[in-house]
UniProtKB/Swiss-Prot annotation:
Cytoplasmic side: 127-137, 198-218, 297-324, 390-442
Membrane topology category: Multi-pass membrane protein
Ranges facing Extracellular side: 27-101, 164-175, 244-271, 351-362
PTM per Swiss-Prot/TrEMBL: Palmitoylation of Cys-402 was confirmed by the palmitoylation of Cys-402 in a deletion mutant lacking both Cys-403 and Cys-405.
Disulfide bond as UniProt keyword: yes
Cysteine-cysteine disulfides: 174-255
Gene symbol of the encoding locus: EDNRB
Outcome of substituting residue 17 to F: No effect on cell membrane location
Subcellular localization, as worded in the UniProt entry: Cell membrane
Function as written in the Swiss-Prot or TrEMBL entry: Non-specific receptor for endothelin 1, 2, and 3. Mediates its action by association with G proteins that activate a phosphatidylinositol-calcium second messenger system.
Annotated protein name in UniProt: Endothelin receptor type B
Lipid-modified sites (S-palmitoyl cysteine): 402-403, 405
Principal localisation: membrane
Amino acid sequence: MQPPPSLCGRALVALVLACGLSRIWGEERGFPPDRATPLLQTAEIMTPPTKTLWPKGSNASLARSLAPAEVPKGDRTAGSPPRTISPPPCQGPIEIKETFKYINTVVSCLVFVLGIIGNSTLLRIIYKNKCMRNGPNILIASLALGDLLHIVIDIPINVYKLLAEDWPFGAEMCKLVPFIQKASVGITVLSLCALSIDRYRAVASWSRIKGIGVPKWTAVEIVLIWVVSVVLAVPEAIGFDIITMDYKGSYLRICLLHPVQKTAFMQFYKTAKDWWLFSFYFCLPLAITAFFYTLMTCEMLRKKSGMQIALNDHLKQRREVAKTVFCLVLVFALCWLPLHLSRILKLTLYNQNDPNRCELLSFLLVLDYIGINMASLNSCINPIALYLVSKRFKNCFKSCLCCWCQSFEEKQSLEEKQSCLKFKANDHGYDNFRSSNKYSSS
């Protein structure tokens, strides 16, 4: 026996009302409707099923731009959790990322090849040529060794990670890669600072004419540079971890600085990281170089009238070394400026609730990717800069790379002897000059 039609209609209406009420109740309790969940993009990091974690860095802006905006407190129902309104998604950053994926791969491969050849050749030149083993060149060798360590370990892993999109290694490699990268940058920064100070000391004390070999103070400087760089890179190894990301129905593993840190120090480090990197790893070497090179210029102008003709060759050598160090600092500044500029602009100008944020976000992402490529170039460009600026390094590079002679040692042996004899002759002439001035003044 079938129920009356009126009863069927009433039951259907009651069922529809019940479904509607349950849907409204679910939305008020924080459960989103079926079609209200925003499309997850590549930078949205989630810990299933309810919590969303955002990475810190250039892609974090993309993730936050696609995240739901929070409703003001005045519009919430008392006792209910915050509801969100989805802002319109930005499509430009996705296309930018796909474009720069291949550009970054080509640049990284170029840096890998040039960096290994250039830095290895530079280390070999300083090791084989005895007259090249002085204080500034040993610091340059330390800088090249740090760059070589970064090139051999970090660049292949970063290229593989960029193409695979999913982190293919374990948590140990996730911590090791940023640790080595930050230690390498620290070695570069502190080595440039030490070179600038060394050039001022060389000009300020004309009597401090060095022979062949590594001074003890330079060896202590190198040890301190490496120890301090490693210590300052430890927070990177502590803070980085693997996070699971829900993307289009599949889970991806991403290596990044974890948004939730366990200690108060690491939470502060995560918050102030961009400003710390900008101040210590960028502004510090530029400020120290500007300060000591200003003092060095004033010292050279003050003592120029009292110089002897016999010291002209030695003075030219010191000026060439000073010019080389200044060129290395200038290359460092040009390579790292776009990356630091993009991070600082992101911190100061970007607002995820701004309706015009997509244009600014696209510009910042382009600047960030350009900065990443230029920062990678800094690992291989120092040998090229030395080749272009220093005549001695240029001759050594030609002899070692182009094989213009049968043996590098055979060709350089005569030049080494002549250079050393000339160096000692200038030293002897300067001693005679000092003794004559001493007796004349007495």
